[in-house]
């Protein structure tokens, strides 16, 4: 049986398929105010990870969706990564997922139903890992494979993590190493070594379930997950929503193994340039190396966690319970000319 390589059937990969931040802002521009719906605690005003609707009993229902084209060749692994990525938005908001339904597009004239089933099975495995059902979905015949989830979650209102909740006295942490876009581009260019792509896959298939616990800590003010807009893009969203700036200590940012090697070989995804064109004017002057790493599109990336400097002990203790030995990669500051300074 011929080996199927799903990445050969798509023009983009993972969260690198995202529309650029600048173009997305233009598309979503509207004069309609969310104040028409007072129960909607979180909408699209501050580019949060999920919508939150107040149920009136101290809790809110969370709703989010995420889907993309294959970032790996194996069908089951693609489904698992896509589902893990979609679930991340619920954890980033401080919530717990309740159930999911699938979003599925398949080129039925090109790829078999057996391969399609493997994608769904991978998505179901991620949902089972999160303790929720994959309860249904919708499918279409599409030119390229597409898979993802719409996820419903729940959160205590006091634990709701909003982009606008950070202050200027936080340390910034990231829970996964970055470089997914560079490594998967190396895979597409057939330069990747098996061990390196395996490490990337393991990272992408790991749930950000720690977010639901971090949100209960008084010292954690907010979180967001790092996905298609890169570390700088998602950090800038929090800073702008909160009216603050941030310093990133570049050499403290953790990288997946051999990211620097593949970057030097020119394995730079096109989305990195699009990302920087959208928000580069908000960033201090940076080197090509810094730009190519910090704007690299992540798929199922880690959580950016904003922790009050006075409350690190409880955060470190909680992180270690999830096997996370974290160090700050930066800090927030009062608002300055540049939203982010890379040091």
UniProtKB/Swiss-Prot annotation:
Its cofactor is Mg(2+). The record marks 18 as: Important for catalytic activity. One of its GO terms (cellular component) is cytoplasm. GO terms for molecular function: ATP binding; magnesium ion binding; selenide, water dikinase activity. One of its GO terms (biological process) is selenocysteine biosynthetic process. CDD domains: SelD. Its EC number is 2.7.9.3. Mg(2+) binds at residues 49, 89, 225. Binds 1 Mg(2+) ion per monomer. Synthesizes selenophosphate from selenide and ATP. HAMAP family: SelD. This is Selenide, water dikinase.
């Amino acid at each position: 049986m011929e080996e199927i390589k799903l990445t050969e059937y798509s023009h983009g990969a993972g969260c690198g398929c995202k529309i650029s931040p600048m173009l997305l802002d233009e598309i979503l521009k509207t004069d309609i105010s969310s104040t028409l719906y007072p129960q909607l605690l979180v909408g699209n005003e501050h580019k949060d990870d999920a919508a939150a609707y107040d149920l009136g009993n101290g809790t809110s229902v969370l709703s989010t969706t995420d889907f993309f084209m294959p970032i790996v060749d194996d069908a089951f692994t693609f489904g698992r990564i896509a589902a893990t990525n979609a679930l991340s938005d619920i954890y980033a908001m401080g919530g717990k997922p309740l159930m999911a339904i699938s979003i599925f597009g398949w080129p039925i004239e090109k790829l078999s139903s057996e391969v399609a089933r493997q994608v769904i099975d991978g998505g179901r495995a991620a949902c089972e890992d999160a303790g929720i059902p994959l309860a249904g979905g919708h499918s279409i015949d599409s030119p390229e494979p597409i898979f993802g989830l719409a996820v419903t979650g729940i959160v205590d209102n006091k634990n709701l993590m909003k982009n606008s909740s950070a202050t200027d006295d936080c340390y910034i942490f990231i829970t996964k190493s970055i470089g997914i876009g560079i490594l998967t581009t190396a895979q597409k260019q057939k330069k990747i070594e098996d061990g390196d792509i395996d490490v990337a896959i393991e990272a992408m298939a790991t749930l950000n379930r720690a977010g639901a616990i971090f949100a209960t800590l008084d010292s954690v003010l907010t979180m967001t997950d790092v996905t298609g807009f890169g570390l700088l893009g998602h950090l800038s969203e929090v800073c702008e929503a909160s009216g603050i700036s941030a310093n990133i200590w570049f050499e403290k940012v953790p990288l997946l193994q051999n990211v620097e090697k593949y970057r030097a070989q020119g394995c730079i995804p096109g989305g990195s340039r699009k990302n920087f064109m959208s928000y580069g004017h908000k960033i201090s002057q940076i080197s090509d190396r810094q730009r190519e790493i910090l704007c690299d599109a992540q798929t199922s990336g880690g959580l950016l966690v904003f922790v009050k400097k006075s409350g690190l002990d409880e955060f470190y203790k909680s992180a270690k319970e999830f096997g996370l030995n974290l160090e700050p990669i930066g800090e927030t500051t009062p608002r300055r000319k540049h939203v982010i300074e890379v040091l």
